[in-house]
């Protein structure tokens, strides 16, 4: 049944206008973005089909075009709409924390870094440069590939910290496997980096590993 044949009170766009976006299901929100379905399948049904096939919203928004192109109704135009929506969410979160200024807690950093790194399908190592009041100066993605002592170059991180006149920083990388448990290489790289930064009086506040649905904090776990 076409959405236009639904009672007005049940249509996603009308529900959003009448109340707010937070009351809509994931499928309904996607339907608002894509606007139309395909023959015999309305936008909500189509979105629900994609979510069921991929295992949820995160998998849908993080997948590349090659993976999504086999789903019916998901062409280049729809893919671009979904990617744009996901990127807007990441930028909104980042700018909200930047306007807030000081990072109030580890959870603030985890929330920001999760949004920035979760969607990558290979490992990415990033730095959040902070001033002496733990206000965000800059966020940068520095290294790509397997994260270990050989691939994470303290010299480059030190150079960027000095450039930003940073007093402290938080580093993070993602685990594409979805499991955020630290490896021995993660532990060794963290220790090596902490010692290198101490030589220029820059504090390493945390190393956060981003998983599929949660994250791991070296600081919270007493490993820093």
UniProtKB/Swiss-Prot annotation:
Zn(2+) binds at residues 173, 175, 186. Residues 102-224 form the MPN domain. A motif (JAMM motif) lies at residues 173-186. It comes from the Bacteria. One of its GO terms (molecular function) is metal ion binding. Keywords: Hydrolase, Metal-binding, Metalloprotease, Protease, Zinc. Belongs to the UPF0758 family. This is UPF0758 protein CBUD_1789.
């Amino acid at each position: 049944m076409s959405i236009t044949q639904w009672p007005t009170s049940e249509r996603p766009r009308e529900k959003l206008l009448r109340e707010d976006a937070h009351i809509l299901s994931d499928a309904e929100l996607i339907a608002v973005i894509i606007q139309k379905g395909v023959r015999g399948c309305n936008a909500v049904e189509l979105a629900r089909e994609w979510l069921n096939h991929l295992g949820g919203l995160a998998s849908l928004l993080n997948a590349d075009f090659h993976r999504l192109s086999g789903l019916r109704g998901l062409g280049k135009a729809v893919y671009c709409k979904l990617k744009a929506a996901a990127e807007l969410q990441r930028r909104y979160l980042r700018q909200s924390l930047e306007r807030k200024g000081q990072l109030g807690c580890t959870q603030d950093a985890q929330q920001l870094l999760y949004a920035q790194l979760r969607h990558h399908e290979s490992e990415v190592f990033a730095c959040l440069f902070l001033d002496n009041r733990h206000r965000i100066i800059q966020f940068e993605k520095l290294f790509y590939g397997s994260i270990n002592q050989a691939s994470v170059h303290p010299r480059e991180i030190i150079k960027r910290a000095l450039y930003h006149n940073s007093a402290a920083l938080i580093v993070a990388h993602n685990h594409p496997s979805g499991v955020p448990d630290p490896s021995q290489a993660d532990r060794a790289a963290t220790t090596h980096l902490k010692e290198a930064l101490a030589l220029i009086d820059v504090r390493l506040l945390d190393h956060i590993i981003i998983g599929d649905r949660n994250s791991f904090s070296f600081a919270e776990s007493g490993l820093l």
